[in-house]
Amino acid sequence: MNTKNLTLQTYFPTLIGVITNPDHQTLENKLTKKCLKLRKKIKSGGENWISNETYNTLGTYHLSEDPDFSNINDFVTNQVIHYCKAQSIDLNCLDTDPLAWLSLYKKNNYQEWHAHTPAMISAAYYLRCNDSSAKIYFKNPVDTMLPPKVLSYNNLNFEQVEFQPKPGMLLIFKSHLYHCVAQQQNNDIRICLSYNYRRKD
């Protein structure tokens, strides 16, 4: 059997955009203090979350309306536009006024598997973290009922992928993609700013 001419053509890819904000260091300390103040005065959101001890402002405080976060908000939106352009997504259908909230992880906090539907594009920006902060995991959206035995994993057959957060790192993904956050093991705080971009009607 001649396999020399076999080519593997990639279709239906799962795209995760990754970039680091070059201006992050000028923003981290000020906005970390702001997030800690918000935790003291704003009720935690995330109704019906299993991980209900993880502080978040989903539905209780909108970061997209806070001018203190405007630099990061603008950075995220600009990168989401690049992400869409790379896939020839019609920008006229992208609502560039996102729903944005913060999640603050202390030791033993986590986030269960979830997706961000009915949003269209989602993003996670890491405001405060270190090299041992909890990782984020993404699950392969294709559920194979009878998976083959895999000898070694690569970007063609991963069942899930993980990212180690770094300060200023931004991840962009389609909102249907399931993801979770491992349990925070260290005593430092991990602050993630999350964004949901909806489709315009």
Task: Locate predicted features.
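Non-heme Fe(II)/2-oxoglutarate
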Residues: 1-90, 110
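Short proline/glycine-enriched turn/loop segments at secondary-structure junctions
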Residues: 7, 112, 182-186
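A general secondary-structure signal for short beta-strands and their flanking turns/coil
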Residues: 12-14, 118-120, 188-190
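Hydrophobic residues positioned within well-ordered beta-strands of beta-sheet architectures
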Residues: 17, 98-100, 121-123, 191-195
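Solvent-exposed residues in well-ordered beta-strands and their adjoining turns
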Residues: 20-22, 105, 126-128, 196-200
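A short coil-to-beta-strand element that immediately follows conserved catalytic motifs
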Residues: 89-100
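Catalytic core of non-heme Fe(II) oxygenases with the double-stranded beta-helix
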Residues: 102-172
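Catalytic core of Fe(II)/2-oxoglutarate
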Residues: 152-201
